Amino acid sequence: MDACTFVYLGGLYRWSPTGTDRIGLRGPYLASLRTQKTGQTSVPNDVSAYLTAMGIRAAGFTRMLASSNDTMIWLNYDQMLAWELANNGRLPLSASYQRAPGPATLTFAQVVRDGENRITLVCAPEGVTLTSYYRVGLVRARQLLARETGSYFEIDHQEVLPQQSARARLVNDAIVFSRPLSMGQLASLLSTYSMGAWVKDKNGAVRYGFTIGPVTVKDSFPGYYADCEKIVPRSPAQAPRQVVAPNT
């Protein structure tokens, strides 16, 4: 790879190309990344170590190089995000869950260029509660809340129903709002690539918030749903029916 590529990949926040902008790898550097004798594609150890240090999966380059034999490879928006070559201002999502007596709490967190996005899921005997923390700084949070007309969650780009009337609130430097979930909604959230938390602006055309992909870090919370099932009582519709033998 040439110096420009190394500089780009070495950035903490890497934006994917939009509009007429393009990012690519040129011929002389592609040859050094391809294994000529076997026809297979590989990433040299020094390059792989650099990519790993930058938080990038070397396997992304392997797939990219294997997709074409051209002397110039252009990368599009979707490819760069899927292969984690670009993060568009968001560092990798993390999830933390440690089973303990009492409510089961799962936390998703992601550092972004202008703050932090955090989601907590709490399973208690009263039910499942989903809470969003949109940290954008005290001044910005106050500005957004002054224009807020409502807040909502999405799973797979669909608003979580039923709609809630509760307004978002300010907690330190974060915009915070919560809502209850059913166990079915919890299962959908844990397995989705797109879960969103949004605040509506009063002009109706703008919303503020973030999305995360819980399923991408599913190995960090094994057993969470099963633990919740043990904590949250079944609704009458879910509980197994008891069959009483008729009197003889």
Regions found by a protein language model. Give the residues of each.
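Charged, low-complexity, helix-prone segments enriched in Lys/Glu/Asp/Gln
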Residues: R14, P44-S48, S220-C228
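A generic "folded-domain core" signal
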Residues: G89-T248
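Functionally engaged cysteine thiol sites
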Residues: M1-V7, T41-S42, V122-V128, C228
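Short secondary-structure transition/capping segments
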Residues: G10-S16, N45, N69-W74, G102-R118
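Residue-level marker of positions within ordered structural domains that often coincide
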Residues: L12-Y13, I56, L85, S194
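Charged, glycine-interspersed solvent-exposed loop segments at helix/strand-loop junctions
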Residues: G24-Q98
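Glycine-rich beta-to-alpha active-site loop
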Residues: M1-L30
